[in-house]
Swiss-Prot record:
Single GO term (MF): ribosome binding
Keywords recorded for this protein, A-Z: Chaperone, Cytoplasm, Ribosome biogenesis, rRNA processing
Compartments where located: Cytoplasm
Its job: An accessory protein needed during the final step in the assembly of 30S ribosomal subunit, possibly for assembly of the head region. Essential for efficient processing of 16S rRNA. May be needed both before and after RbfA during the maturation of 16S rRNA. It has affinity for free ribosomal 30S subunits but not for 70S ribosomes.
Entry's free-text remark on domains: The PRC barrel domain binds ribosomal protein uS19.
InterPro entries the UniProt entry points to: PRC_barrel-like_sf (IPR011033), PRC_RimM (IPR056792), RimM (IPR011961), RimM_N (IPR002676), RimM_N_sf (IPR036976), Transl_B-barrel_sf (IPR009000)
Alphabetized SUPFAM superfamilies for the sequence: PRC-barrel domain (SSF50346), Translation proteins (SSF50447)
Stated name of the protein: Ribosome maturation factor RimM
The organism of origin for this protein: Pseudomonas fluorescens (strain SBW25)
Amino acid sequence: MNATPAVADDLIVIGKIYSVHGVRGEVKVYSFTDPTENLLQYKTWTLKREGSVKQVELVSGRGSDKFLVAKLKGLDDREEARLLAGYEICVPRNLFPELTDGEYYWYQLEGLKVIDQLGQLFGKIDHLLETGANDVMVVKPCAGSLDDRERLLPYTKQCVLAVDLEAGEMKVEWDADF
């Protein structure tokens, strides 16, 4: 394991190690990628937890019913693997595949100001949630917001009118009373 990770501002969280698997040092991983197995395409991971940062190399991985199982280079013991529980798995954003126009990674949407069709500022996108039907944006109030309410807005074509990453804004069709 290497202690010299990539620049922290360039790293995007794509998963989390949450437990050990078996007795040979494998770890159980929750993937934030879609599909979940995409996490296994990245061979070098930067692990972060409470100020601790380290780089590891993925040797192999496989899917299971509810999680991924990963084997990391130099990790051959269950007790060593247990120490990695709770670490976030990060990779540099420049390794992400290019998207087509109108497609965005969640990290690109987080922090955007959300403005309705009347020009009212609802707040900023704090994070997104994956639901069965569609993704949901959690919009928290910020300086200049219409009110101090947290809003949950669907990330759908009907709701999202425009995304302007340069301006840091998203225009939405949404009733302020919802």
